[in-house]
C-alpha cells in the first residue's frame, strides 16, 4: 500500500509528499521498518528501497514464487525528498541536516515535521534498518553500524550479510539522529552503510538487496517455502579498533586500493602528487593490518586529512552469541 504520511504545501510548486509503502500478511506479529534517503545524496539507499518495493509488490500479487507475507513491512524510501530532487545532500530551502532533526516536531520547521512523521510511523516497529552511505568525498565498503547491541540485535545484524559492524561515535549529533531515537525506544536496529554519495552502484545494490530479503526471512515477516534465512558471521569493531591513515601533504590523492580489501601493515594506500608538477610528495602507508572500510574518493586533499579507515584485526572479534 502506498500512503502519503505527510504533505507540506509549497509556494513555488506542488506540495512535498512524504510516502510510505507497506505490506501486511496474517497474522501480524512483527513489523520491520526500512528507511532510506535521510540525506538527498543517498542514492544507493533510495534505489535499494525501490528495488525492495517492486519485489514486495510482486510477493503481495503472488507473482514472486515461494514467498509469503507473514508480518508487516514498511518502507520510507526518500525521507529528504526535496534535497533528492535538487541533487543535493541538504535541501537548499533551509539547509538543515535532516538527521539532526529527530525525534522532530509536528509544529516545527519543515525538516522537523518530516522527522516527526518518520519517527511516529516507525517507533513501534520490532526491527529497523536505516540505509546510508559514506560521507562526502568518501566511499564505504558495505558494513553495519550498531551501538551496544543485545543478543537479538546481533542476530538481526547477522542476517544482513556485511562482514563487519562498527560502533558509532558517541557525540551530541548522535543523540539527534533517527538511529539513536530508535535505540532509546529499545527498537533493535542497525545502519547499513555502503557506497558513496551522489552515486548509484546497481551491482552493489543487488548484493545488499539479497541481504535485506534474507533479514526479512529471519525476522519472520516474510517466509519462503523452499529456504530458510542464512546466518552470516559478523566481526564487531569498537571505536578503539579503527585505525586512520592521514595525508602527509596536500595535493592530488591517487588511490592504489579499493574499499572492502584486506590491507597489510606497511602497504601503500596511494600516492599524493603535487597538483602542478605531478611529483610524488607523499606515499601514505597502513600502520596495521586491517579491513579497509572507508576510503577517500575525492582526489584533492589537504595535509592531515583522513584518507582511509582500517578495522584492525582482533583475536576475539566475532560475536560469540
Please identify what each model-predicted range represents.
Residues 1-321:
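Structured catalytic-domain cores with a bias toward divalent-metal coordination
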